[in-house]
Amino acid sequence: MMSGTADLAGVYAAVEESAGLLDVSCAREKVWPILAAFEDVLPTAVIAFRVATNARHEGEFDCRFTVPGSIDPYAVALDKGLTHRSGHPIETLVADVQKHCAVDSYGVDFGVVGGFKKIWVYFPGGRHESLAHLGEIPSMPPGLAATEGFFARYGLADKVDLIGVDYASKTMNVYFAASPEVVSAPTVLAMHREIGLPDPSEQMLDFCSRAFGVYTTLNWDSSKVERIAYSVKTEDPLELSARLGSKVEQFLKSVPYGIDTPKMVYAAVTAGGEEYYKLQSYYQWRTDSRLNLSYIGGRS
């Protein structure tokens, strides 16, 4: 679907239909208020749908869309009652980042069951942030500064492309642009072993070698890295060496949107050794979006 054609009812119908392909019921009372709150940006937004293969995401279907840098998505979410303050440092993080860093644009993520979940903060294309600079922000998770040396050893500490703020799980993702060397099998194994994560399977190592980006998950209760995940852009996810599972494969074959647009596949290993994948397909795509610059810049 081309940009400029999104409308509230049309987007909602597409979300509901796509979730139904996975036998997930769309909770209108959760989804409609989010779309309505950002109705003005939907016609020009990148709009994506995401499914995951792990048990934690069973019964959920995630959607996300981009928001221009001139709009503060957290302020909108608060104003429209999509989220509420509880006194956690995560609630000031987006505002603190705005004060310390140049911001290009944002993304908003929600589940059709769980409602509002995340905000992404994209830094300007070609102007990566560093962990050292981000670590000066008082509301950042303590693990950011604690793991700076680890990521510096692998050439990632000054390659931060964006961050993801997860209000539902009280975690933060840091997304790095990765060179081919960083996602090679020896380096991936070394990173996992250094922080005590299980070795990926041979299948996953092959997948990782195609990645343009790496991201890590941090929280405010620990200085440890929760996980490391790898991002691959592909035209045909079924050709990847990834265990997408029958439901996700059926979704790929059945979803009527984004047939000719790129797909994103993410892979991760949990601390318990579970390997899982997330597939992201696009209802509405824009080649000039900051999102596409991330793909291009990740391997430049």
UniProtKB/Swiss-Prot annotation:
It comes from the Bacteria. Its EC number is 2.5.1.123. InterPro entries: Aro_prenylTrfase (IPR033964), Prenyltransferase_CloQ (IPR020965), PrenylTrfase-like_sf (IPR036239). Keywords: Prenyltransferase, Transferase. Does not require magnesium or any other divalent metal ions for activity. One of its GO terms (molecular function) is prenyltransferase activity. Disruption phenotype: Mutant still produces endophenazine A, but does not produce FNQ I. The keyword Transferase applies. It catalyses: flaviolin + (2E)-geranyl diphosphate = 3-linalylflaviolin + diphosphate. The keyword Ribonucleoprotein does not apply. Pfam families: PTase_Orf2 (PF11468). Belongs to the aromatic prenyltransferase family. Monomer. Involved in the biosynthesis of furanonaphthoquinone I (FNQ I). Catalyzes C- and O-prenylations of different phenolic substrates. With 1,3-dihydroxynaphthalene and 4-hydroxybenzoate as substrates, catalyzes O-prenylations. This is Flaviolin linalyltransferase. The gene is fnq26.
